[in-house]
């Protein structure tokens, strides 16, 4: 399954990498490509795996479609919701002999980072919902510090993709509920981005 995921990532990159070839593709071919990837995405969204190692692979398949999401932002909300569903389906394990769930949870948070980089501006309209979900999970004690930090890093990548420095304070305000430690980090990061 891992080999197929790498193959998918290669195909998605070859088609949607921004080289301009896809933009020049005729409408009918674009429609067929979109339908193919949309069908694949629907299959991925409908999966209900519960084993941590399979959830990691599931997350990798979803983040392989990041460049596709850049061109078809109407499906971004479904992917974001699925990633949060995968994250919360795994138990929080702070200590114990098995840290498979903890590693899988971190990998799902890393998928947010990879999708943020690849999907570019497609995630901007979803930032408030992402921040609200992060705050909710944090408030419920269902988000570990390392997971929170990964998600905040993804959030910063999303904010920087806007390219509009004037909008960064608004993005910063979305995360102010995440505590003074992150507020300082966000101010520092946004200053460096400016």
What spans do the regions from the language model cover?
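Karyopherin-beta/Importin-beta family HEAT-repeat alpha-solenoid scaffold
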Residues: 1-194
């Amino acid at each position: 399954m891992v080999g197929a995921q790498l193959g998918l990532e290669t195909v998605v990159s070859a088609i949607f990498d921004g080289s301009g070839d896809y933009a020049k593709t005729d409408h009918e071919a674009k429609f067929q490509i979109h339908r193919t990837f949309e069908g694949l995405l629907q299959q991925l969204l409908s999966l209900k795996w519960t084993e941590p190692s399979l959830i990691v692979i599931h997350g990798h398949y979803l983040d392989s479609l990041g460049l596709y999401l850049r061109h078809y932002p109407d499906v971004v909300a479904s992917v974001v919701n699925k990633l949060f569903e995968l994250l919360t389906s795994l138990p929080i394990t702070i200590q114990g002999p098995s840290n498979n769930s903890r590693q899988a949870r971190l990998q799902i948070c890393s998928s947010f980072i990879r999708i943020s980089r690849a999907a570019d501006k497609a995630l901007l309209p979803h930032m408030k919902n992402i921040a609200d979900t992060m705050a909710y999970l944090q408030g419920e004690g269902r988000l570990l510090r390392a997971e929170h930090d990964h998600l905040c890093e993804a959030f910063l990548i999303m904010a920087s993709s806007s390219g509009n420095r004037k909008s960064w304070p608004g993005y910063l305000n979305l995360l102010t509920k995440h505590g003074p430690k992150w507020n300082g980090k966000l101010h520092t990061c946004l200053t460096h981005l400016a």
